[in-house]
Amino acid sequence: MFWRARTTSGRAICLSDQFPGIKVEEVMRGRVTFVGLPPVDLGTDVDWTANPHGNRSWALNLHALRWAGRLVAEYERTGEPAYLDSASALIAHWIRENPRDRPGVSPWAWAEHAVALRAPALVCLSEHVRTPALWDSLAEHGEILADPSLYRQGHNHGLDQDIALLVVGCRLGRARWRDLAIRRMTASAELAIDAQGVLHEQAPRYGLYVHRRLGVALRAIRESGAEPPQRLVARRAALEAYIAHATQPDGRLVSIGDSPADARADGFRHEGPVVRVFEGGYVFGRTAWDDPRSAYYSIRFGPGRRLHGHEDHLGVTYMAQGRRILVEAGFHSYERTGFVEWTRSPQAHNVPVVTGVFKPGKATRLIGSSIGPSRQSFELADDAYGVTRTRRVLVGHGPDLMAVHDSVARGTLRSLWHFDPALEVVSRGDGRVVLGDGDWRVTLLHFPGAGQAVRPGLVCPGYLRTAEAVTVLSPEAAGVLTVIVPGADAPRVSVSGDVMTVHTPGGPVQLPYSQST
């Protein structure tokens, strides 16, 4: 039985505004909804080993107990004692049923991220009720969070561990835990975020998550009575440029790595150049800020795949005229399935795939670039297939056009192009594919054209969602030129010497061209 706390060991820093929204009355009846999956009736005698959807994220959310923490927040907001009583009973039941040394306990109960997310909920509860079991559990959580062998340095989980350790340390009056948390999160931020703001987890969505969580961390540090380290403040500020440039004109983050295609990033400052090269492995370009019809593109290079990254090096995405054109398969989920594994493979991205054996984790070099107001070009190379493959990307604005030349030193390659699900094939032939959405058209041209293929594919418009999409494969060759012309239905192309002229709706565009490509 919980009893009202009259004394505390230290200050309770309750981060209740960070708990997810819930349907309070449903939770009071024992029904929960996590990660957009159908509701589950837990009842009053919760089976903590349950995972009815067989979903890793669902199980994590169950054991994180942030949904119970939200009941505490609702009690604080409304004064309704039933909410606090329900949260107290749920957390007491979890503590009783999930001792670390008991066989058969869910592996998610003491997973490092579950511990980090759950501890702040226990702290919030401790502001209103107190039992030996709750205090013992807080101490146990603190010991785990302080354990260097369980710490995820340079990872978003590590940041959550530090936030949790800080608030537990303050609650239990253990200043050494608070100080350890601040030291670790500062060192971890400098490892995870480079001076330009690129997060080494290789997914813009995680840049957004870490930025938000660092904001929580800075607030918790101040509430603890300490001064936030300026090094930590600076790394959080640096993230803002990376997030802003990774945000497409439609307000959604570009779906690179484990970034859901429907994730939004609003409100970030975006002054400065419209094209920026981030040495951590990204080129982001657009024609204008704050214009939903702006052209936009991304290019991937840099260190090999790590953490939340995909095998997307040399990959591009492209928007123009208010339309998504080239997309990638994107992020589906954290489930361990063949499809999810495929979404992380080169074949799920707009890249040249060389005939041969792929060598994962290879870095890609940005060899050169030329950035002008209406035309930019970039050259990249790597040896991901044991042989040098090179990609040259040219993007033109006004008129809009993207041209990509892929080549391999030995052997052959095929370039893959994944189109937005809104686009359907209107016509095809002779190395040309015209796609459309309503009356709007975009044309893909291949040189050489013989052997081009069009296949049905799948992309992920959101978490656990798939949509049918068109995938175009270039002919197999040692070198292939791909030209994307937005707003055009089979534009005329002419060649004179080593110059190709593409007659777009906005006017002619000239490209360097070799008959041998």
Positions of PLM-derived features:
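Aromatic-lined, polymer-binding surfaces characteristic
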Residues: 56-236
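Carbohydrate-active enzyme catalytic cores, enriched for enzymes
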Residues: 166, 194-327, 331, 372, ...
